């Protein structure tokens, strides 16, 4: 059985694919989640997160851009952008404590991002959580 952490990692993968230009990724979410063994409640959780990010992508991206220090949104790595989008959505619209969301994002970034990514992600998300 998949965990919420694994479900979030799958959502980051979906957002990553979307960001790389796969605009029809939404048509394949069920297949992708099944392939990653994200099922039942965790599948519902993952779909809720993915659909929530996509439905709120403009305010999510605006919050990220507002808190980037000396960075251009388009220059962010696709993994970092996907992770920031998911975590920002959860901070702004979710029910979890921001510290938990930030920790999850940092852990996901450790798995997918560069060596410097976790610190960067932590800083941006901390600023977003303080400003919400």
Swiss-Prot record:
Family matches, as HAMAP family: NusB
Family annotation (InterPro entries): NusB-like_sf, NusB_fam, NusB_RsmB_TIM44
Annotated coiled-coil segments of the chain: none
Keyword Cell membrane: no
Name of this chain's protein: Transcription antitermination protein NusB
Job description of the protein: Involved in transcription antitermination. Required for transcription of ribosomal RNA (rRNA) genes. Binds specifically to the boxA antiterminator sequence of the ribosomal RNA (rrn) operons.
Single Gene Ontology MF annotation: RNA binding
Keywords: RNA-binding, Transcription, Transcription antitermination, Transcription regulation
Source organism superkingdom: Bacteria
GO annotation (BP), single: DNA-templated transcription termination
Keyword Chloroplast among record annotations: no
GO terms for cellular component: cytosol
Family stated for the protein in its record: Belongs to the NusB family.
Classification via NCBIfam families: nusB (TIGR01951)
